[in-house]
């Protein structure tokens, strides 16, 4: 017996004894019940994809138009954040190179000037042991010497020559002093040259470690790390 015949037999048996006027109504209810019992259960309904909850697990083909737009928005935002991160990383790298690691940076010139001061016999005689000579920038509320900024300026004159000028404080076991530095990179040259580097110590004569007039008499100097010595 096929399913249709079986359904008819069942219906005729179920409606036996029911008034004729009620049979059409009961038949429709009975059919709906039978259809519901025979239906295949659906799987759990998935959550709608938005730019804030999309994890990429739902395949692209199963997304609606709105969900595809949401995923595209999320991916565009993520790509933009990656670009911003790369730009910030490049900016930090450029800053570190120009201000710290480059041979022409202020930090490099400051460190070389301090090394020259510590190794000069006249400075050692006036200020004391070279190993105990320290240099730092302007006084601040910070007790750490290394955190005190060194006053400096970089300019380019009308002829295209680059100038670096700075002053900082030098402390030794015997005395304290103030150092001043002026360096020039002439247009068309690749190295900075000292115009002057001197230290003023109270009750002592100014000590010149570099002076353009005196250095020019000594002929051409050796160039290393972007500075002529």
From Swiss-Prot:
Cellular compartments annotated: Mitochondrion inner membrane
Keywords: Membrane, Mitochondrion, Mitochondrion inner membrane, Protein transport, Transit peptide, Translocation, Transmembrane, Transmembrane helix, Transport
Principal place of residence: mitochondrion
Keyword Membrane listed: yes
Extent of the transit peptide: 1-31
Mitochondrial intermembrane side: 98-229
Organism domain of life: Eukaryota
Transmembrane segments: 77-97
GO terms under cellular component: TIM23 mitochondrial import inner membrane translocase complex
UniProt keyword Protein transport present: yes
Disulfide bridges in this chain: none
InterPro entries named in the record: Tim21 (IPR013261), Tim21_IMS_sf (IPR038552)
Membrane topology: Single-pass membrane protein
Example GO biological process: protein import into mitochondrial matrix
Gene3D superfamilies with a match to the protein in the record: Mitochondrial import inner membrane translocase subunit Tim21
Mitochondrial matrix topological intervals: 32-76
Summary of subunit composition and partner proteins: Component of the TIM23 complex, at least composed of TIM23, TIM17, TIM50 and TIM21.
Function (record text): Essential component of the TIM23 complex, a complex that mediates the translocation of transit peptide-containing proteins across the mitochondrial inner membrane. Required to keep the TOM and the TIM23 complexes in close contact. At some point, it is released from the TOM23 complex to allow protein translocation into the mitochondrial matrix.
Family from the record: Belongs to the TIM21 family.
Record-given protein name: Mitochondrial import inner membrane translocase subunit TIM21
Origin organism lineage: Eukaryota, Fungi, Dikarya, Ascomycota, Pezizomycotina
Gene name of this polypeptide: TIM21
């Amino acid at each position: 017996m096929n399913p249709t015949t079986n359904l008819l037999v069942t219906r005729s048996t179920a409606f036996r004894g029911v008034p004729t006027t009620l049979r059409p109504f009961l038949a429709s209810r009975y059919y709906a019940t039978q259809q519901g019992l025979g239906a295949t259960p659906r799987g759990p309904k998935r959550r709608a994809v938005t730019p804030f909850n999309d994890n990429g697990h739902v395949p692209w083909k199963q997304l609606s138009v709105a969900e595809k737009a949401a995923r595209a928005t999320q991916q565009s935002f993520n790509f933009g954040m990656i670009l911003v991160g790369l730009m910030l990383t490049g900016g930090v790298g450029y800053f570190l190179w120009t201000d710290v690691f480059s041979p022409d940076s202020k930090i490099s010139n400051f460190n070389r000037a301090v090394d020259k001061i510590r190794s000069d016999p006249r400075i050692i005689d006036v200020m004391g042991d070279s190993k105990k000579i320290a240099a730092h920038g302007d006084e601040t509320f910070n007790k750490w010497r290394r955190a005190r900024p060194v006053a400096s300026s970089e300019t380019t004159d009308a002829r295209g020559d680059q100038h670096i000028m700075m002053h900082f404080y030098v402390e030794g076991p015997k005395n304290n002093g103030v150092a001043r530095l002026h360096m020039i990179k002439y247009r068309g040259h690749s190295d900075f040259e000292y115009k002057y580097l001197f230290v003023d110590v109270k009750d002592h004569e100014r000590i010149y470690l570099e002076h353009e007039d005196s250095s020019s008499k000594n002929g051409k100097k050796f160039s290393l790390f972007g500075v002529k010595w």
